[in-house]
Structures are given as C-alpha cells and as structure tokens.
Amino acid sequence: MADLRLERVLWRHGCQVIGVDEAGRGPLAGPVVAAACILPPDAALPGVDDSKRMTEKRREAAFAAIQAVAVGWGIGIVDAARIDEINILQATFEAMAQAVEGARAMAAARPGRTAEAALLVDGNRPLPLWPGWQRTVVGGDHKSLSIAAASILAKVTRDRMMIEYDAHYPEYGFARNKGYGSREHWDALERYGPCPLHRRTFIGPRQIRFF
C-alpha cells in the first residue's frame, strides 16, 4: 500500500514534494493524461493505492478525497494528433510538464511560503528539462502516496473523457474499453476505420481508412 515514506525524506529537507503519474500511454485512441499532486504532511487518504489496483467506484471516491486534501494538483492532456506528431514518450513528458505547472500554480495561490519543488515521477524516465531535483520510482504508484494520488487523478480524468467520447463515437465502445485494443475495438476499426480520436501511429495501415 502506498505511503508517505519517500515524501517524508524530502519534507525534512524543506521540499515541496510533487507526485507525477500518467494514464493512457498504451491505448489506440484518446489522449494521454498526466497528473501531479502535492500532498500535505498530514495527508490521510486510506485505501489510496495504484489506480490499476482499485475498482472504478473506489477510484471515483478517492478522486474527490484527493482534491479535497491536496495542497495543489494539476492535469495535463495531450491529444491523439499531438501523440502522432511527437511520439507517445514525448507526449507523456509534455502532459506531465503541464500537470506539474498546474499543481505548482495551485499551491502558489495558497497563503504561505512556496518551498523548492522536488518531483517523484512514476517509472524509470525522468522529466526532461525539469530544472530541480527529481527521482524516478519504478512502481511508484504502489510506493508513494503522492504518486498514487496522481495516478488516480490521471486515470479518473481520462476515463471520464473516454466515456464522454463514447457518446460521439459509440461504435468503438470507448465507454467500455477506454480506447484500449480490445477485440471489440479492433473489430470496430476493421469495420469503420479510425475516428479523429485514434492514434494513427498505434494502428496498422490495414485499419486506416481516411474519410
């Protein structure tokens, strides 16, 4: 279960700790969404863990709880066209940078001194061009509460977007598959071709039928 041990080390050095994670690197359709979360030292978020280990109902409840507790949080969204333009890795970094900027701006708007920011980034790739201290944490959404909170913010935001997109493109089953490559989704691509939400670089030429 995620906890605050990593954060406490940084808090002792006077840092503002920002957990960073993403959702949606692998789907065939939809955006990649990143989130950044700044928790206070007394944060109490029982049951918050890696978003993939939680039920949808628990994630939704945690989403509201995290927003209520956090000192600052931010969301970054990069759409399919941009993913195709710069590749998924760079798009993920772009979304993360947006999210960190949003979280820091929210925290800065609160009374009190703003401490030097330190990032805890899920995975093994540091955020490029970040000028301050950062640490990558493999499996961080199960180790750091700040990263786990960010993972929930990112996933719930993205899932809600895909459910909304389903109303516009119901043939692809986005509400169910969230843009991932389920059999239903691949069958729909074979039948209808891609829609504007699809990542052209993620699907083979066989499925691409331009309108």
From Swiss-Prot:
Substrates-to-products reaction catalysed: Endonucleolytic cleavage to 5'-phosphomonoester
Q: Which InterPro entries match?
A: RNase_HII (IPR022898), RNase_HII/HIII (IPR001352), RNase_HII/HIII_dom (IPR024567), RNaseH-like_sf (IPR012337), RNaseH_sf (IPR036397)
- Function according to Swiss-Prot or TrEMBL: Endonuclease that specifically degrades the RNA of RNA-DNA hybrids.
One GO cellular component term: ribonuclease H2 complex
The similarity comment for this entry is: Belongs to the RNase HII family.
- Per UniProt, where does a divalent metal cation bind? 21-22, 122
Q: How is the cofactor bound?
A: Manganese or magnesium. Binds 1 divalent metal ion per monomer in the absence of substrate. May bind a second metal ion after substrate binding.
Q: Where is the RNase H type-2 domain?
A: 15-211
Its Enzyme Commission number(s) read 3.1.26.4
Sorted alphabetically, the keyword list is: Cytoplasm, Endonuclease, Hydrolase, Manganese, Metal-binding, Nuclease
Q: SUPFAM superfamilies given for it?
A: Ribonuclease H-like
Subcellular location(s) of the protein: Cytoplasm
What's a Gene Ontology MF term here? RNA binding
What are the leading ranks of the lineage? Bacteria, Bacillati, Bacillota, Clostridia, Eubacteriales
Biological processes annotated in GO: DNA replication, removal of RNA primer; mismatch repair
User: Can you say what this protein is called?
Assistant: Ribonuclease HII 2
Chief location category: cytoplasm
The cofactors named for this UniProt entry are: Mn(2+); Mg(2+)
Indicate yes or no for the key word Lyase.
Answer: no
